Amino acid sequence: MRQALPLVTRQGDRIAIVSGLRTPFARQATAFHGIPAVDLGKMVVGELLARSEIPADAIEQLVFGQVVQMPEAPNIAREIVLGTGMNVHTDAYSVSRACATSFQAVANVAESLMAGTIRAGIAGGADSSSVLPIGVSKALARVLVDVNKARTTRQRLTLFSRLRLRDLLPVPPAVAEYSTGLRMGDTAEQMAKTYGITREQQDALAHRSHQRAAQAWAEGKLAEEVMTTYVPPYKNPFAEDNNIRGASTLADYAKLRPAFDRKHGSVTAANSTPLTDGAAAVILMTESRAKELGLRPLGYLRSYAFTAIDVWQDMLLGPAWSTPLALERAGLTMADLTLFDMHEAFAAQTLANLQLLGSERFACEVLGRAQATGEVDDAKFNVLGGSIAYGHPFAATGARMITQTLHELRRRGGGFGLVTACAAGGLGAAMVLEAE
């Protein structure tokens, strides 16, 4: 094992995560229908600051992410600062790393803390699959630019006459890789076939996720980390995730048809995460700054790692690549972990990564390591359910996982937790957290 890389400031302070919060997650076109991501971000950051009772001017930086970008608000982070009563001089910028976006936001704030340029910051992300940047065809886009430069009505009419009826149809954003054209579900199907993952195994994992999430809500474990929201017309509160199927049975999952490979596939809507709306954020500080403000941290950021692989085949293997690197940088092994939380983009992707984490062959031949990262103990894995149940507002999922894992570590008396995710573009992210 290589030498650990401690995440500390120049003064030796650890990176403390003092609090975290999220909105409830809503299935596309339900409770948050019509609410843009920037407004979801304002909701969660405003409430996070109010609950923490931290002076607004104590926050020196806000790094926020959004995957489905809206042209009218390209820097969501700055709009959140301006819309929540924070000090207008607060530094704010936006990041995007697909499904690992809020992991990146946390890493960026942590790096600012370690560099000594700030002592406290907020990191998070928000996405709306209900408010989308609906575009136009390339042909229409070109004509519109030319029309804007045309000087006469005749020139404008001539330009429009070149268009066909199909050129006028709206173009929704593609949920596919730009470089390959493959949808995420196509990659999940690849992985199911490559690693011999059956439909029954996928359905069982999805069912487990929903059962664990429903139990977490029933036992009140999520109440402290999920805010109650009110949206126009402000008549009814929205306080709990609305995707969780607590009363479902395995037989219900078996009824669904494959969603991507219609003839020979095993990936369905039920064993995949749904399109979702929501936001999540965390407050990070140096350990000494938290003490000055009289705050008891939820926990500490021990290490993080980002990786990238090719996108043509089985590209959602980010956790299998980033997990050993994050553990190595933390000076830990899989056996040292109290909790292991993996983003469930698809059941097939999750099961493939779990399989490879325990594979000596993958470790030696692909990663160039002497031994496998280690089998993940089922008693430590996604103990409160995962993204298949909660949903996946792309940029918010990492902050949800971090907050959820730290609260659960505290309930268990402390320890180490690892959170990890795959992301579009063949990217992977992992973070090791510590609670006392």
UniProtKB/Swiss-Prot annotation:
Instruction: Extract the InterPro entries matched here.
Output: Ac-CoA_C-AcTrfase_FadI (IPR012806), Thiolase (IPR002155), Thiolase-like (IPR016039), Thiolase_acyl_enz_int_AS (IPR020615), Thiolase_AS (IPR020610), Thiolase_C (IPR020617), Thiolase_CS (IPR020613), Thiolase_N (IPR020616)
Give the CC-aspect GO terms: cytosol
Molecular function (GO) terms for this protein are:
acetyl-CoA C-acyltransferase activity
The record's listing under Gene3D superfamilies reads: 3.40.47.10
The subcellular localization recorded is: Cytoplasm
Q: Which domain of life is it from?
A: Bacteria
The record's catalysed reaction(s) read: an acyl-CoA + acetyl-CoA = a 3-oxoacyl-CoA + CoA
Question: Which pathway is this protein engaged in?
Answer: Lipid metabolism; fatty acid beta-oxidation
Q: Which UniProt keywords apply?
A: Acyltransferase, Cytoplasm, Fatty acid metabolism, Lipid degradation, Lipid metabolism, Transferase
Coiled coil feature spans: none
Q: Where, by residue number, is the active site? A: C99, H392, C422
Q: Which PROSITE patterns match?
A: THIOLASE_1, THIOLASE_2, THIOLASE_3
- Could you provide one GO biological process annotation from this protein's UniProt record? fatty acid beta-oxidation
Q: What are the transmembrane regions?
A: none
**Chief location bin:** cytoplasm
- Look up the EC number in the record and give it: 2.3.1.16
Q: What does this protein do?
A: Catalyzes the final step of fatty acid oxidation in which acetyl-CoA is released and the CoA ester of a fatty acid two carbons shorter is formed.
The similarity annotation says: Belongs to the thiolase-like superfamily. Thiolase family.
The record ties this protein, via NCBIfam families, to:
AcCoA-C-Actrans, FadI, PRK08963.1
Record text on subunit structure and interactions: Heterotetramer of two alpha chains (FadJ) and two beta chains (FadI).
The entry's protein name is 3-ketoacyl-CoA thiolase
What species does this protein belong to?
Salmonella heidelberg (strain SL476)
Q: What is the lineage of its organism?
A: Bacteria, Pseudomonadati, Pseudomonadota, Gammaproteobacteria, Enterobacterales
Q: Which gene encodes it?
A: fadI
